[in-house]
């Protein structure tokens, strides 16, 4: 086994460790709230009349996830199943739904809205533990014994079945679009070194009225997850002056940076970063063009240099795009 393959194996362990922690923390987040309510997770009923848009979304996503996971299991695609469930738990359950509902579930007053959010999260997590059990049997049983005290072991339960009545493809598509906008806002923050604490305004220029309505339905969620102070949506909206832009499904995102950044200083910073990255890339290219180095150095060392070069080329491309936007 080479040094590179050993490193890749270590990385896999770290990924699974981090995922296990993420799942554990999601269950730990809910548990004290259940204690406060004096209820077991399995006892909480869901009230459909109180479903918010994000509740309908996560419940629909869960049903489609159950259907896809069932197919993968029946076809013995265990690696595909593990990766698929990883993304659902990490991205949809933890990074999206939990972030949206955190304030509601953490509130001191036990309102009907809080009870319903807890019931939905309990239902989602119970199904998550069932779905993950074939690939993570030990931690799923442990979490089940804590969160669903008194219920049967996961291994004894029937495999989850999708509830077709909860599937809403339109809502799932709307949220896919909303999360693409959120990721684009975060990408702009990263490109221009804008702190997550800094409130930004944004304009989403869409191609048609249907897309406009879809984005507007999710405006509150986009604003909250992106750290925006203001969000406007319009068909063929004009690009504001001194704005960063990003392509999103069905349109384009504009983020005005006037008042956030000093135009001249930011252009100078980007030019300096590009110059620095180009110089570094040139030195790496020179090293990699030396056949004596490539053939004589350990494979891991050569691969590390190639990775460094790819990183510098990525920095150059991103900064050149950012520079083009500001000019």
Language model feature labels by segment:
Residues 2-327:
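Feature 926 captures the class I aminoacyl-tRNA synthetase adenylation module centered on the KMSKS loop
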């Amino acid at each position: 086994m080479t040094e590179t393959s050993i490193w890749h194996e270590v990385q896999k362990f770290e990924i699974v460790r981090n995922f296990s922690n993420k799942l554990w923390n999601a269950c730990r987040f809910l548990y004290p709230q259940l204690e406060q309510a004096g209820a077991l997770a399995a006892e909480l009923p869901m009230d459909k009349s109180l479903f918010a848009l994000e509740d309908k979304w996560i419940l629909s996503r869960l049903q489609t996830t159950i259907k896809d996971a069932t197919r993968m299991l029946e076809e013995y695609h265990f690696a595909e199943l593990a990766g698929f469930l990883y993304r659902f738990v990490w991205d949809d359950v933890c990074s999206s739904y939990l972030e949206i509902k955190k304030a509601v579930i953490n509130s001191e007053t036990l309102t009907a809205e809080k009870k319903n959010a807890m019931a939905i999260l309990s239902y989602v997590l119970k199904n998550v533990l069932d779905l993950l059990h074939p690939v993570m049997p030990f931690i799923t049983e442990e979490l089940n014994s804590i969160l669903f005290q008194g219920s049967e072991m996961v291994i004894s339960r029937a495999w989850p079945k999708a509830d077709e009545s909860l599937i809403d493809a339109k809502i799932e598509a709307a949220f896919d679009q909303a999360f693409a906008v959120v990721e684009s806002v975060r990408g702009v923050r990263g490109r221009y070194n804008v702190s997550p604490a800094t409130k930004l305004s944004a304009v989403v220029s869409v191609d048609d009225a249907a897309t406009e309505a879809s984005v507007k339905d999710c405006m509150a969620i986009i604003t909250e997850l992106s750290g925006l102070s203001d969000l406007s949506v319009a068909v063929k909206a004009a690009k504001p002056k001194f704005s960063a832009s990003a392509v999103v499904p069905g349109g384009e995102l504009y983020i005005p940076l006037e008042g956030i950044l000093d135009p001249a200083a930011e252009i100078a910073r980007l030019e300096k970063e590009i110059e620095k990255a180009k110089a570094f890339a040139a030195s790496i290219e020179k090293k990699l063009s030396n056949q004596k180095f490539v053939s004589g150095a350990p494979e891991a060392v050569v691969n590390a240099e190639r990775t460094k070069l790819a990183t510098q080329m990525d920095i150059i491309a991103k900064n050149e795009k950012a520079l083009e936007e500001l000019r």
